[in-house]
Amino acid sequence: MIGLNRSSHVKGFGEVMMHSLVRSSAVLLLALLTGCSGTPQATSEAVPGDGGVPGFYTWAGDLPSRPGQLLRSEPLTPQQGLKNAALNIRILYTSTEGRSNGPIGVSGALFIPEGTPPKGGWPLMAWAHGTVGSADVCAPSFAGRSGRDTRYLNEWLGRGYAIVATDYEGLGTPGLHPFGLSSPLAYGVLDSIRAVQRANFNLSSRVVVFGQSQGGRAAFATAVYKKTYAPELNIVGVVATGTPYPMASGHAGIFGQDTSRDQVTPSLAYNLLRLSTAGLINPSFVATDHLSDRAKPAFEVSQRGCLHAIERKFVADGLTFNNSFRRSPEAVLDQVNRESSYPTLTSDIPIFIGTGGKDVVSPVRSQIALVKDACAAGDRVEWHYYPQLDHSGAVNGSLPDSTRFVEKAFSGEFMAGNCGAIGAIRPR
């Protein structure tokens, strides 16, 4: 645990913000003063799921071309914030659109812990959240966070780490969320780091990126995109749990085993989100041409609702893989899978990967394939296997191991990983 002079109570936002403003540059001051919530925007008909969030999330003027620039910020509500943070801030910053490479705005949040920052500033962690849906109203900085994630992030804040948490491209902000694609996920994380470090929040230059599920993919992606996209950042470690691996052989990473295709499984709802991404990759693709009549109502929910609502609808309508489609989506979803692949597995950043042995959302076999392939690529992987934990359980269940890993990463200790011992583990 990082030593802190922790205050006995959570300070009011105004008191802490005043201290922050004294330290901050004129650019940050302008950003803080110009941020405003306004009233929720009307839902856009052009992009399903757009709108329903305050005007803060839409930048009305021309976007600066420089990625990682803080555009504005404002306090989060108590429901959107974290109890172990002295400062809970919503942010809007510039990033790069994952497919066109044009400038976009991306939203997120910054959480500053209680107490006095250590010399060199608060050690910074960049959180990449798991799947929440594709509608703007699902953005964690607006909708809040699950109990699992709240517990997890509060644990890190209590240990003295500041956290920047991107919403990702198209969540909260205008445009379609490119669910699962690796480059926009990585860009959103990397530019969130740039934005808060440049804004003088008294943050360290060293950063650890951590994420779960879709966020595990994002965290791993930052490790491989960092060298070309944000070489100036000092990322000293990556922590990923429940990490999907689009390059795993066959269709196991998408569909599960053939025996599951007639089972009503909530995790199959992720396929509906992938269909929206398919439309982004190929504008001529019409998802409803592939869906059965039985599955179309659930698809409509996936366009405007968040993950738990999609899963509930999927189960309530008795949907399986086999009864959801009238035309096979495999070629389309394979294309999404290819577009989701990492450009390389090679990274010089130490990587912690935690796998729950009962994970059926990101299949254990595909996670092990990622670990083995990353090791073969020369990565310094520290893999931890938790036989009794499922996809969600691996998040907090890995804390005893991941906290030690992060402490070592920030200390500058060389971490060789445990690739040599991984061959003894066989996938189930």
Mark where each language-model region is.
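Short beta-strand element of the alpha/beta-hydrolase
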Residues: 120-132
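C-terminal motif of bacterial Sec signal peptides marking the signal peptidase cleavage site
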Residues: 33-35
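Short beta-strand/loop motif that positions the catalytic acidic residue
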Residues: 352-355, 359
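C-terminal catalytic histidine-bearing segment of alpha/beta-hydrolase fold enzymes
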Residues: 329, 334-337, 361, 368-428
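Catalytic-loop region of hydrolases
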Residues: 37-117, 375, 426-428
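Alpha/beta-hydrolase active-site loop
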Residues: 179-199
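Primarily recognizes the serine-hydrolase "nucleophile elbow" in alpha/beta-hydrolase
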Residues: 194-200, 204-262
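Accessory cap/linker subdomain of secreted extracellular hydrolases
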Residues: 57-61, 244-344
